[in-house]
Regions:
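FAD-binding core/adjacent interface of flavoenzyme oxidoreductases
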Residues: 1-8, 66-106
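Beta1-alpha1 glycine-rich phosphate/pyrophosphate-binding loop at the start
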Residues: 3-68
Length: 106
């Protein structure tokens, strides 16, 4: 049975973590509080020093997430986590083997 890992945060770190876990045969689930994946990258124009448009990077990451069939839960926050899993605001508990916090920065 595949291990299930909940990733809290759907920014670049969360998406990259999910992709790496999927490559290792793990079943990742991304929980993102916003309506779409991307985190701070959604508000950036270009990346330094290459001046690659941020939208290109974001589009590619989202494509790879979808291609891998990684479960994504947007507009969802984690209220807490324990040995049983991650608790959602509606009281549901998402069972998992591990939790990775990729909550980003402000």
């Amino acid at each position: 049975m595949k291990k299930r890992v909940i990733i809290i945060g759907g920014g670049v770190a969360g998406m990259q973590t999910a992709l790496r876990l999927a490559e290792q045969g793990v079943s990742p689930v991304i929980i993102e509080k916003e309506a779409e994946l991307g985190g701070k990258l959604r508000g950036w124009h270009v990346l330094f020093p290459s001046f690659t448009p941020a939208s290109e990077i974001l589009t590619e990451l989202r494509r790879r997430i979808a291609e891998r069939g990684i479960e994504v839960m947007t507009r969802t926050e984690a209220r807490g986590f324990s040995r049983e899993g991650v608790q959602l605001p509606d009281g549901r508990m998402l069972a998992c083997d591990s939790v990775v916090v990729c909550s980003g920065f402000t």
